[in-house]
Structure formats: C-alpha cells, structure tokens
C-alpha cells in the first residue's frame, strides 16, 4: 500500500510539473517556415558543367577590368575572351572603355554587343593545363578537354557542351554622377542613395531602380554592382572611410527596406535581365578607412554585426516560397549576388584579442557569415558571391605593408578558397600599367587551370562555384544561351529618354530643413523676396575628371543656382528676382578674404578617392587636378557680399583636405563679421553632417539636398523661395543638430496606438454589443500602425507590450514584449475567466492606445473599443518637418490601478519568471525538508520521501490554482506581483509538510504509549 501511494504521489508530481507551465497565458507567436527553393535552371547548369572543358570552367570564375575600347580580334580583350574564356568584364569610364557624351548609350550598346560576339567565337587550340614541377598529375585527375571529350552522363545528368556562354558585363552606377556612376550622360541623372533615403518612402527607391534597370538592360549591362547596403549609424565627416551620400541612411531597418525596394525595381525594369549584387557585405558602415587604400579593422563581434551591419543584407536575402523560373524571388527584393568586401574584425567570434583576416580572404570568417540562417537559405537558393576588386592597394598592403610586391596567384587563390564564387580582378597589378595587369590576369587563370587538373578538392570547389554562375546566367537569359539573346538594339539605346519627371518628384520629397525648426523658419527667412533685394550665390568649385585625358568639369557649375532662380523667378516668370541684383561666385573666390591660395586642389566628387584608371604604357594619376596656384579672386566678391541681402552657399562635402572646402570653413570662422545682419543660407548638395554646431549657428537657415543632380538644384531653389515645403527628413544622425536617429525612429509619445481584436467592432463603431465570447476563447490583438517621431512606421523589432487589466480585482498583467513588423505588433491572448478585462498596448515612450473592453457574463458577453485622448509628453522639437499629430476623441484616459502604481505593473500571475522561480523554490524547499527530516525526526527513508513528495505536489497544485485565476488569488498578485506564484506555492508546500509532521508525530506518540 505504501509503495502504491508513493508511486501515485510521484505521478501527480510529474503531471503537475508538466501542466504547470501551460497555465500561464503565453502569447502565440508562430513563424511560418518557408522551404528553401531549388535554384532555377540548376539541372540545366549541371548538364552544361558536365560538358565543359577545364579552360571553360576556370575562365568563368573571373570578371576583369580592362583598358581601352579596342575589341577587334587581335586585341587584348579579345584574347582574354576567346582563348582564356573569362566569365565577364567590368566597364569603367576611367579605363577608357567608353567616353561619356550624348551618344554614350549607343556606343556602350555597340561595345557590349561586340564583346558578347567574341564570347561566341571558337578559341585557338587550347593550351593544355600542365602542372608545375612540384605537382604530380595522375591520369584520373585530368579533366577532359572540350575539343576531344565526349559528353557523358554525370550523376544521371546528360552532359551538354555549350558553344556560347554569355559574359557578365558589370557596372557601378550608384547615382549622383561621377565617380560612382560610370555613365554620366545620356541616361536619367539619378540621385544619390542618401537623397532617396531622405524621402523615407521605399517606393522612391523602387522607382529609381526600375529606371536604372530599364536603361542599363537596353545597353547590354547584365550585372549591377549595387545598391550600397552599408549602414551609416555614426557619420564620420572627413574620415577616409566616410561614405557620404552613397548609403540610404543610418537605420538598419530602413536601409534594408530601401535596398529591397531598389532591387525589386531593377528586376522589374530590366525584365529580370540584370543581376543585382548588393555591397559591401558584411557592411562598411563602421569602417574608418577607405578599403581601396587600407584594410580597415572593426572591433565588433558577429552578434553585434547581426544587429546593425548585417540587418540590411538579411532584408535582401529573403527567399520567397515560390520563386519564378526567371528570378530568385524578386518579389521579395532578394539580390542575385553579394559583393564581399575587404574588411577585418576584432572579437568576431568573441575573443577580443583575435582578429580575422579580410573577410573576402578568410575561409573561417566567410563561412561563419554564410552559415547564418538568413544567408544560408539564400545561398542554398542559388545566391552568388563576388569578391571586391582583388588588386586594390588595401589588399596589396595587407600582404606587403610596403606595397613593393604583389603575388597575384596567392591573392586570387586565397579569395577563391575563402568561398567567393566570382573573382573580380580589378587593378590587378602593383602599378597602373595595363600590360602588367594583363600578364597577372593570364598567369592567374593558367595557375587555376593547373590547380583544377592536379587538385581534386580545388576542382570540386570550381565546379560548385561554376554551377551557381551558370544557373545565374541561365536565369538572366531564361535558359537560352544563343548569341542572339545577348544582343541589344543599338538604335533603341540611342533613343533612351531620361525620366526627369520621376527624379524631380523624388527631389521634391527629399529636401530637408536642418535648422532652424519649421516653426521658426518664416520669422528668420521670408520667402517673399523683393525685387530690390540682392542675392549672392557662392558655390563649391570642385571639378570632376572621369579619366586622365578627359576634360574636367565642375561638379556644380558656378552660375547653376543663379540660372535656375532667374528662370523660375526672373523677369520672364514672377519678377521676384532682378538679374542686375544677382551674382555668383565660387568658394575659391573667398580667398580674397584670406589671401592667395598656394595649395593644389584635388578634384573629388566625394571624400573617397576616384578609382585608379588603367594605362596602356604610362602610370596615370588617380585623382584629377583642377588648379595649381589659385587665380586672383574675382574682383567684386567683397562688394557683392557687403551689399547682399541674401547669401546662399552651395556645399558639397566639406573635406578639409580640399582647399575650396577649407576656404569656406575659414570664411565662416574668421570673417563672420561680413555676414552680420544678412540672411545666410547653406544648401548641402552632399552629405549634410560636415558643419559643426558653431558653424551652423552662424547660418540663418540650413537645408540638405543630398545630390548635385540638376533636379535637386531646382528643388532646393523652390524651397528657398517658399514655393515648396522642405518635405524630407534626415536619414542619418547629426550630433551638431542634436538629431539622433535612434530617438527619431522610436515611437512618437504623442500618438494614440490603434488597437484591434479579431472579429470585433472597429473604433468607428465603438458601441457595446453582444458577442459570443466565452472563457477559454482567444483574441487576436493587433496594435498599430505605430509611428515614429518623423511620422513614419517604426522599424521592425520595436518592442510593444499588451496590458490586460482587471478593474474589479484591481490587477494588471503586462504580457511579454512582442516585436513589430511593418509597424504592427500582434499577439493572441486567452480569455481566462468571467468578468471584465481591459486591454491596451504600450510602445515606450508611447503610452496611449485604444482600449478594448471585454465583459464575459453568465448569459451574454460584450466587447467595445474606446479611443482615449493622448497625454502629450514634452519633448524637444525635432529639427525636421513636424510630425502631424493624430486626432483623438475627448475620452479621458484610464487611470492606473493600485496594483500598477504600487508594483510598477506586475508581469502577471503566471509569467515565465514566476514559473522558473517557483520551480527552484520548491526544489529548494523539498531538499531542505528532506535534510531536516533526516536530522530531527526518527522517520524511515520511505516515509520521509513520501512527505517530501506530498509537500512538492501541494505546492504545484496551488501554483496551478494561482495561474488559473482561482478566487482570492488577485490579492496575492496585487501584493507580490509575479513573485506571488512562488510565495504561495512555497507556503502551501511548507504547510502540508508541517501538517504531515504533526500527524506523524502523533502517530509516533501513540505507538510509544
């Protein structure tokens, strides 16, 4: 009988231990698992691979940069394409592949057609891959040559010998002109990514991507190195690693949203004929060096990278459940490839003393990144990785800090073994000499051929990468590898009409007021200029040079703003501007206030140096020069400034290494007296974070335009004259303005969060009504959309808490926080018992939300939604356009319950914390009881453990009653919060143990008598 009771008690304990955690009302948060789709054209790619020669296989791994535009049969590039079977080329204006001009689109289309035709030509008799003297080749390791091998089945796949494999023809086209857009004439002058980010509308990124995809595909471009997915969480004005306007912004969520939208646009515009390669994986946002010059080292762990740098790449590697035959889930904005950057990390795997090699060259770091679930699924679906240019100075200095040698074979092999599928051989030599780089390219390809023949592991790695490459090319050409499919219509390319209206619309939405506030602007800068007022425009006069022999041109023409102002508001328009009272000068003219300039100005469109062009014989200067010793200052700038009513400075980036920018900053610092009692406006046509707080204080107004495209110059003038409002908002943090992106993207404290429940009335129908709700039913709650302080939906991952209040019992349960997605948080709660419950949502610092009142009675139930009046929290006014406040009905907000005020809001009667604490408390109580019984009572071992088990069971029974909301438990919850479960369970356990001891003692006494 005793053993029976012991077994029964043990069963009860086990049962309640399993059931107890289920008593807590845990939210249902399910995530649908999307199966990884098979890469499109995978089987066709495998069949082609089986029929390819060694030379064909190896050559496909390489994209090269080349010099000139000579593609005749005897040219260097023809030799590389026909005899070395290279897989692709990267076009650059700096390498004289084409000359920008009105006919550039047609000339580029002709060039790509001729390059693809070269790929269709048969090679000269192939040079057999011979091993180096130190390698022994066995017959079984020799791959069949394409000219002599017969197509044999491999793994059940019939081999197909390809006669033509289209070339990858790649391009950088980031927007905002040179140097990061190769084609600067004949196409739509797209803005910078930062300008698009300032609109906070991903739709604009999709529009820009669609325009770019449509135009580039008509030129025969099939690989786009972009968009830039780096996150500028902390701007670095003037630092070598400063990204300037090349990024979408500083918030990982929004960079990902814009990046995915841009990818969708390119895919749609090109009809899926362009492979989009996001860069610079895993992110250069924290870099303090220019990667092309020196490999940066960033002190971040992999976990830290996942929070910021990697988040946008996760957003563009989302694979849909059912991709089409021509794209890898393009509807999700998934990129086709990732450009792997040369960046190192300290503490990558947690050890702060250990540093990785550059990720592009480090197999361990590369595989750790590719093994992340978000990236692994994309890779499994056919995602291709491209190395960044392997010949840049930063890579050379990594191997030889003195930059005196360059081992081309080693660099290429280590980049390939690290995991890159495609090797980009850009600047592939110690100097800028094209003959030297050409020799390195040929030697490297021959070295890879030898390794393929002699090393089975290496050969398997080549086949794996080549399968991805072939599948991607098949996708671009819908499985049709015929020379005709790779040709484009040259006449159609010549007739491309720029989409200027679309760019103008983006410009209108991006112009941002930085200082003062929108409320104070009319008082200090009246847009109603009188005809008798004088205006002086002073423009940064840096020049851009696209190649060493190209004629330089100004980034912003000196009279550009003046011409726009006269066109819009001159005598032939509104008559607000008198041509005789408008004058234009340059930053160099400001030397008249400081003395002559003796430095040589470096022409840069941004703070990052221009890429190095190739030379056929001579070393070419990598940065163009605009002036030597400065010419005498324009005679009249002092008089013009003295007589001016409005002075407008047109800025690019203010890199102090550029003399023109230094002159402007010196002018603000040393001659602020010349600006006294004048309206002074600065327009930032580059990144807007270069001025410090003191410099900004000397300005009447400060606007950001982010781009020097003509549409943005016009939009800035329209805002200046009051014709259009500054509709944009800063996408990056600026310390000088006390503008924190983290604060601005947090929930607006003055909003009322919409809250709905499934199948209930909406706020517009907020009247009580009968509803069939019963105890045990579930309610699907939905809070949102939740907006940030700029009026946009909050980033994904913003925590939201649903609060269940029981007015009668004066108890409140705060559920575990859930994260938003697209500005909305969802949770399922269970109606636990009869009575009244009020449900609301909190997203700190936003406290006000709709209130859902649920009343469950014996015969009927009711539910209603009430919209309370928000309680504004005093916050500093942001420096951007004000956020429209949501309207609210005049219903007083619910008062806090006593339980909430005394406990700060309990987590609930059956929270996970309470369960864990109860579990350990009961274990400790049972152990203590067992030890105490052994020490103080003469009870045998069996009876002793029986008492412990009964006390343990009693504790769990009380816990279940507490979690289920048994009558009277509310008082315990109000007094102890989530500690109540443990307190009550331990008390019950001790009480049962004490009673058992008393009973056992009486039995012992009776036995003694």
Residue ranges of model-derived segments:
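Hydrophobic faces of well-ordered beta-strands that scaffold small-molecule active sites
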Residues: 59-66, 87-91, 167-175, 223-227, ...
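Short acidic, glycine-rich surface-loop motifs adjacent to enzyme active sites
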Residues: 81-104, 225, 237, 241, ...
């Amino acid at each position: 009988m005793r053993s029976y009771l012991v077994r029964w008690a043990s069963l009860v304990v086990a049962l309640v231990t399993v059931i107890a955690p289920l008593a807590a009302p845990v939210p249902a948060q399910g995530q649908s698992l999307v199966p990884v789709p098979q890469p499109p054209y995978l089987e066709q790619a495998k069949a082609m691979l089986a029929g390819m020669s060694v030379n064909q296989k190896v050559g496909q791994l390489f994209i090269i940069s080349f010099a000139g535009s000579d593609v005749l049969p005897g040219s260097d590039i023809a030799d590389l394409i026909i005899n070395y079977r290279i897989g692709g080329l990267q076009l650059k204006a700096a390498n004289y592949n084409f000359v920008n001009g009105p006919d550039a689109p047609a000339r580029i289309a002709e060039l790509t057609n001729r390059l693809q035709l070269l790929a269709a030509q048969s090679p000269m008799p192939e040079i057999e891959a011979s091993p180096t003297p130190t390698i022994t080749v066995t017959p079984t390791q020799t791959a069949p040559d394409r000219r002599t091998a017969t197509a044999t089945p491999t793994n059940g796949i019939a081999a197909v010998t390809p006669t033509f494999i289209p070339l990858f023809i790649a391009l950088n086209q980031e927007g905002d002109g040179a140097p990061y857009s190769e084609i600067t004439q004949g196409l739509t002058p797209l803005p910078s990514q930062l300008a698009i980010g300032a609109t906070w509308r991903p739709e604009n990124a999709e529009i820009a991507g669609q325009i770019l995809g449509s135009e580039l595909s008509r030129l025969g471009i099939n690989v786009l190195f972009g968009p830039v997915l780096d996150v500028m969480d902390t701007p670095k004005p003037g630092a070598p690693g400063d990204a300037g306007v090349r990024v979408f912004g500083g918030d990982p969520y929004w960079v990902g949203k814009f990046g995915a939208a841009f990818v969708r646009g390119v895919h749609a515009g090109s009809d899926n004929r362009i492979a989009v390669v996001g860069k610079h994986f895993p992110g250069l946002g924290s870099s303090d060096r220019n990667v092309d010059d020196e490999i940066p080292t960033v002190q971040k762990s992999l976990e830290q990278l996942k929070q910021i740098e990697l988040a946008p790449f996760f957003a563009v590697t989302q694979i849909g459940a059912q991709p089409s035959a021509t794209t890898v889930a393009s509807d999700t904005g998934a990129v086709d490839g990732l450009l792997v950057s040369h960046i190192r990390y300290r503490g990558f795997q947690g050890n702060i003393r250990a540093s990785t090699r550059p990720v592009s060259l480090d197999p361990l770091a590369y595989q750790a990144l590719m093994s992340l679930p978000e990236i692994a699924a994309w890779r499994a679906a056919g995602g291709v990785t491209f190395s960044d240019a392997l010949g840049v100075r930063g890579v050379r200095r990594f191997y030889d800090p003195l930059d005196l040698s360059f081992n081309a074979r080693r660099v290429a092999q280590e980049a390939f073994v690290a995991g890159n599928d495609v090797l980009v051989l850009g600047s592939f030599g110690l100097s800028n000499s094209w003959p030297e780089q050409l020799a390195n390219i040929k030697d490297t390809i021959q070295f890879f051929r030898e390794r393929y023949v002699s090393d089975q592991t290496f050969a398997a790695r080549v086949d794996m990468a080549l399968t991805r490459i072939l599948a991607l090319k098949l996708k671009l050409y819908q499985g049709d590898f015929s020379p005709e499919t790779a040709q484009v219509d040259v006449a159609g390319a010549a007739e491309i009409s720029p989409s200027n209206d679309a760019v103008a619309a983006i410009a209108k939405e991006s112009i941002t007021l930085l200082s003062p506030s929108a409320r104070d602007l009319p008082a200090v800068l009246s847009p109603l200029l009188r005809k008798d007022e004088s205006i002086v425009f002073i423009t940064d006069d840096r020049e851009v040079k696209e190649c060493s022999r190209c004629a330089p041109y100004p980034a912003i023409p000196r009279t550009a703003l003046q011409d726009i102002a006269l066109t819009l508001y001159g005598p032939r328009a509104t008559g607000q501007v008198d041509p005789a009272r408008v004058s234009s000068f340059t930053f160099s003219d400001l030397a008249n206030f400081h003395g002559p300039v003796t430095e040589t100005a470096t022409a840069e469109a941004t703070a990052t140096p221009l890429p190095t062009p190739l030379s056929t014989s001579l070393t070419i200067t990598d940065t163009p020069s605009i002036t030597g010793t400065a010419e005498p200052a324009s005679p009249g700038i002092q008089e013009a400034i003295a007589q001016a009513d409005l002075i407008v400075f047109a800025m690019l980036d203010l890199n102090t290494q550029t003399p023109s920018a230094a002159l402007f900053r010196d002018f603000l610092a040393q001659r602020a007296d010349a600006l006294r009692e004048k309206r002074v406006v600065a327009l930032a046509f580059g990144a807007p974070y270069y001025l410090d707080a003191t410099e900004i204080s000397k300005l009447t107004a400060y606007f950001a335009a982010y781009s020097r495209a003509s549409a943005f110059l016009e939009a800035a003038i329209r805002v200046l004259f009051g014709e259009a409002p500054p509709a944009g908002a800063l996408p990056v943090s600026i310390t000088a303005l006390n503008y924190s992106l983290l604060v601005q993207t947090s929930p607006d404290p003055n909003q009322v969060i919409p809250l709905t429940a499934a199948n209930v009335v909406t706020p517009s129908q907020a009247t009580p009504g009968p509803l069939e709700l019963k105890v045990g039913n579930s309610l699907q709650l939905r809070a949102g959309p939740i907006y940030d302080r700029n009026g946009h939906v909050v980033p994904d991952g913003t925590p939201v808490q649903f609060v269940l209040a029981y007015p009668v019992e004066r108890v409140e349960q705060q559920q575990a926080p859930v994260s938003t997605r697209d500005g909305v948080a969802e949770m399922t709660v269970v109606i636990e018992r009869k009575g009244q419950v009020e449900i609301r949502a909190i997203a700190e610092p936003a406290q006000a939300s709709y209130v859902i009142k649920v009343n469950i009675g014996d015969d009927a139930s009711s539910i209603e939604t009430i919209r309370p009046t928000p309680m504004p929290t005093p916050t500093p006014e942001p420096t951007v356009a004000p956020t429209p406040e949501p309207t609210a009905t005049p219903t007083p907000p619910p008062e806090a319950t006593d339980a909430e005020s005394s406990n700060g809001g309990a987590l609930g009667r059956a929270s996970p914390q309470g369960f864990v604490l109860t579990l350990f408390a009961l274990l400790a109580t049972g152990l203590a009881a067992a030890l105490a019984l052994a020490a103080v009572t003469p009870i045998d071992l069996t009876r002793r453990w029986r008492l412990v088990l009964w006390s343990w069971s009693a504790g769990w029974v009380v816990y279940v009653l507490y979690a289920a909301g048994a009558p009277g438990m509310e008082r315990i919850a109000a007094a102890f919060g989530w500690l109540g479960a443990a307190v009550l369970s331990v008390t019950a356990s001790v009480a049962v143990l004490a009673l058992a001891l008393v009973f056992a003692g009486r039995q012992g006494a009776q036995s003694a008598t």
